[in-house]
């Protein structure tokens, strides 16, 4: 499980999401959030900028993404994703994460599971949403309809 780091003494000029540049799943969602946040967040790989934050252990950058704000506040794992979404104007996910311990627990464990199975979830993401993160296709609706029809037909 990733460690929740709360603060860095090496704050950036603007919010920065630090992610794993070797992860296709991470790159897919980084591209999506970069489009949605419209320049409000800088996106950098930990391979590029880990040395800029010497008080955050490299192993923690490898375990989870980090959103680091100009005041030094650090958001980790799923909350770094929710905070990115927050910057795009959808504040509900970050609020749920900070307000409800059960949502935080499920998010943290879900994130940890996905982090350990990135290849599988990257394939699943592309099957359900398409290959282009800037123009998502909602194939999952079609798959759901097929399942509903098959279940109805069998019963």
Where do the model's predicted regions map?
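Local sequence-structure signature of Cys/Sec-based thiol-disulfide redox active-site neighborhoods
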Residues: 2-36
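Short, well-ordered coil/turn elements that cap or connect secondary structure elements
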Residues: 36-38, 62
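Juxtamembrane boundary at the C-terminal end of a transmembrane helix
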Residues: 148-155
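Thiol/selenol-based redox catalytic cores and closely related redox-interacting motifs
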Residues: 52-146
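Short secondary-structure boundary micro-motifs
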Residues: 1-2, 6-7, 17, 49-52, ...
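Charged, low-complexity, helix/coiled-coil-prone segments
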Residues: 19-28, 47-58, 110
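Thiol-based oxidoreductase modules, predominantly thioredoxin-like and allied folds used
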Residues: 38-52, 67-70
């Amino acid at each position: 499980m990733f460690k929740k780091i709360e603060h860095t003494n090496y704050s950036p000029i603007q919010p920065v999401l630090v992610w794993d540049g070797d992860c296709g799943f991470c790159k897919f969602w980084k591209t999506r959030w970069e489009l949605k946040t419209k320049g409000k967040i800088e996106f950098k790989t930990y391979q590029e900028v880990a040395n800029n934050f010497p008080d955050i252990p490299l192993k923690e950058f490898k375990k989870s993404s980090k959103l680091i704000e100009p005041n030094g506040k650090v958001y980790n794992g799923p909350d770094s994703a929710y905070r990115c979404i927050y910057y795009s104007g959808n504040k509900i996910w970050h609020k749920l994460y900070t307000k409800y311990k059960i949502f935080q627990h499920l998010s943290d464990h879900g994130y940890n599971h996905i982090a350990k199975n990135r290849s599988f979830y990257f394939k699943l993401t592309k099957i359900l949403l398409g290959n282009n993160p800037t123009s998502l296709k909602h194939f999952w609706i079609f798959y759901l309809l097929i399942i509903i029809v098959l279940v109805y037909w069998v019963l």
